[in-house]
Amino acid sequence: MASSMSKAFFADLKPIADHTLIAASSIYKELPADWVVVLTDVKNSTEAIEAGRYKDVNMVGVACIVAVQNALAGHSFPFVFGGDGATLALPADVIDHAKAALTHTRAVARRELGLELRVAIIAAADIVKAGARLAVAKLKISEIQDIALLHGDGWALADSWMKEREAQFSLPDEPAVAGGRAGDLGGLECRWNPLPARKFEVLALIVQARHGGETAAQVYRKILSQLLGPEYRPISLTELRLSWPPKYLIQEARMRCERGARRLGYLMKTYLISLGHVLFLQWRGQKNITEPIEYLRELTQNTDYLKFDGALRMVVDVSRLQKERLLKTLEDLYHTGEIFYGHHADPCALLTCYIQGPHKHIHFVDAGGGGYAMAAKALKAQKRAC
């Protein structure tokens, strides 16, 4: 059982505001040994991407976070969205609630979207015993929202164990618990259609330094120096537009509601709400009301376009010239043996949301057409080539 101090580990971390420090090992604290690492990913996601279903893959990845967050209401824990899955860390004494929530999510993904979700549960102590490091920090991304940062080679080791030692660490495929907090995907929303790039393309990028310590931190700072600033954020007020009908609302309803009258009622209600939002925004534009709607302003800031989980992950809006310069920098760093990297470009960004309240919401962004999943595939190909 986790101690009371251990359980408050993540809640007690003070967030950093300087985004250039996300790779500095000094900002991180070791994950308590009595915690558990939870990893999820969608099996055979490449097939879904080729079928034009990457948004479904994204939705399942976010649903894992939403399900556990709802099941553990009141608990603060780190999580990182990875496109086709998620990484979480939890106190050991709440893991049964998380298992029930993820069992339900896996069953819903299979039944409603035809996607198979892999779930691994690994004790942090086992990862540390293998000689790897698990560390966590917090990054302030807005006045009201922090996100987790993960550091150390233990996260990548856990990911490899999830796939190579699936029989040992996989969550048993048991019948899902019906109803209750374990089956709560409330707050999972997909009301935004794909958001076109403002400049040229939306780029999903994963960069992994090949060396540790200050050398790695300097490499990451060099890359970040080209990509930090409002102009690179993939979501902005000027481009944020609701269109009707929402393209992915049916998938949202299928994930959140049982079949039958409840799902039909949810769809009708949400279609009407989204239509009202569209009409209001159109009226606002005609009346030349320039005051930004508070929620939309918060949305642009509460987006996880920058992440670190042992590798730098970003989704950025770039011009053709910015893309060329960035890729040249990355290619130079790759050929000098300093990094591995993968990227995927698409005309649009995808947004999947977790709404807990008027000022409590986070928005998970990815590039369309495969985004992080295709970037990860390219990075792995680089590693194999070495």
At which residue positions do the language-model features occur?
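Regulatory and interdomain segments flanking nucleotide-handling catalytic cores
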Residues: M1-C386
